[in-house]
């Protein structure tokens, strides 16, 4: 009964045991190609796997390693069963997708086994297409790169052409823009300073000068005849400037340039003497002096850039006689403007004080001289202080020494001499001497010879004037400098350059001492100080905008370091860097420091300066832009000033980045000060970033202003070594500064050389300190309606304190001075670290500098030659190191 139930169906009949694959094979639809067998040994599976992975991922929508590996494993067999593969894949991919997948995969395998390489022809075609596409893409990329490169090349060429144009044309543009505008604007500033509507005009002229040399030319157009001459001289100078800009990069070429500088100095002295004769008449007409000073500013800048010395000799003779143009040219914008105005004022004072010396250059501004002359007795203090207050003067002094007539003026008028020195020293010595010291390497074109000159003069002149000055009062030194000036002008700009240098060192030592003394006297007699410091520095810089010139002049010694930095820049952009040099002694300072120290940054600026000159040129062009715009022109002037002033700021910025921006910004703040007639308005224009810069840059100028802008700036100048000292002997910022100042003072010859090394970093650090401490001062001045005056008053009070400190520090500085001389080499390596200490040490260094400089007046003269040699070597080493590392 039950038998049938269990026997009813066989296993085959029971679907539970049926061969399901057979059923599926019968039921499923397969692509026709699957009928063909594939020999996997002939197939390059590695080429197929990427396609399988891609396809499965497309089907599933995600990358399933299990499925992919399952497929790979099935294909590992020599002769895989295509239908079974499809059946097996149906569970992972649905039936339709599995069929499609196998329909695509199998033809690939079939073509691959037919191909020798085992690669499907489709893949080969795809590869070919891909290769073609890649080639096309590469070609496109290459063409794009080429286009980019071409564009870059074009841009570079355009920039080079522009730079060349700026150099050739803009020996006018730059020299016109920066120097000429400065000079023109400086003459304008003279008028404006006089009228106190100078700043607006200054801006206008700055703009016009900056927007186009045409405007500058238009400004000087009143003296088109002078311009042609200037053009000739400027062209010659531009040639020399252009060469020097490049040559300023190599120290050796600079020395070569020096000889041309001397020759060109003589020629320019002749030309400038001619222009002096004109300038007296033109000094009568400010427009003439403006156009002249602008025109001279161009030639002078070329002269400067060519041979800052030659310009300085010329400037010395001519700036004295043509003081407004010349000094103004030295202050190219700020200095020249302010300095000329100031110079005119002071030269007026000087004229009154000594009409003979100021008569030629001061006769233009005899009226202003009386005011300065009022300070004339203080100016004598200023004269001494002009040593201290005129670190720029010191440079100017050295530079005026080249021009005997100017020196007589100086001698007649301490202020005039100081101012002349400031403007000139800062212009010419600042550029020549400071460049000599600091840019001896970078500036060596003017500076190398100047350094040798200074060394020579430091031997002859320092022996003469140094000992005399050390033994005698500043007047002997001045007379000695006069003699040296005359002899230098007689012997040529070479002796004047030499005199500049020794005088500078003497001036640094003696004058700084005297400056300190005068700063003492100034601080004791705020009116003299304010007159010279505040009026001359401040008025130049800030209130009259001549004080800025003065400050810039006073900074000019420090700016010469900056010049160093911008020797090529100053040379190329010497117009703008000269302002830097002039206006920001701190800036110059720090720039010089950078130049010296980071000859690389400075070289970047200066030696690297050929490129940085573009930057500076760019900066000049920006400056030009600034000039173009009222606030930009202020910025430009201010920025040159700021660059000079903010050398500290700029030095910090430049340390980090020689960014022309910081320079510009700093420039613009200085410009604020420069446009002291409306410095604050400009401050507002330039002050957006420059207000801080203004605090920093203005601070440094104010510091200069406040400490006796010229005195402190110069101290900074000589402190440039001091910051090194500060680093080397950071016993205290003050002691460091004392040491630094003693080094810079007693080692002023030494600092002069060391300024190559030490000043670069000290300048930077000092500049930062100038930035910081001046920034503090500048803050109050900036906040106060008359920041310059406040800073001057503060500077007066601080100077008094510093003078006291200086007295105490003298002994320390003397000791430290010797130590620092040894340390300077080591300190040169620590410019950055010195920067912080320099903030405090910058003030104290200034204080200390006066003492050591006074003390070192006699000592440094003997040691100046040796010190200068050592310092030059150190500076060259530091510059080379900086050139090697910072540019990279």
Curated annotation (Swiss-Prot):
Residues 139-888 are annotated as: Disordered. It is found in: Nucleus. InterPro entries: PWI_dom, PWI_dom_sf, Ser/Arg_repetitive_matrix. Keywords: mRNA processing, mRNA splicing, Nucleus. Residues 780-790 have a biased composition (Polar residues). The keyword Nucleus applies. Its main location: nucleus. GO terms for cellular component: spliceosomal complex. Residues 139-169, 213-232, 254-276, 662-677, 866-876 have a biased composition (Basic and acidic residues). Residues 170-206, 277-325, 332-347, 528-554, 561-585, 614-629, 642-656, 798-823 have a biased composition (Basic residues). Residues 348-364, 473-496, 586-598, 697-712, 728-749, 763-775, 826-843 have a biased composition (Low complexity). SUPFAM superfamilies: PWI domain. Gene3D superfamilies: PWI domain. Pfam families: PWI. One of its GO terms (biological process) is regulation of mRNA splicing, via spliceosome. One of its GO terms (molecular function) is RNA binding. It comes from the Eukaryota. Residues 27-126 form the PWI domain. The keyword Lipoprotein does not apply. Involved in pre-mRNA splicing and processing events. Belongs to the splicing factor SR family. This is Serine/arginine repetitive matrix protein 1.
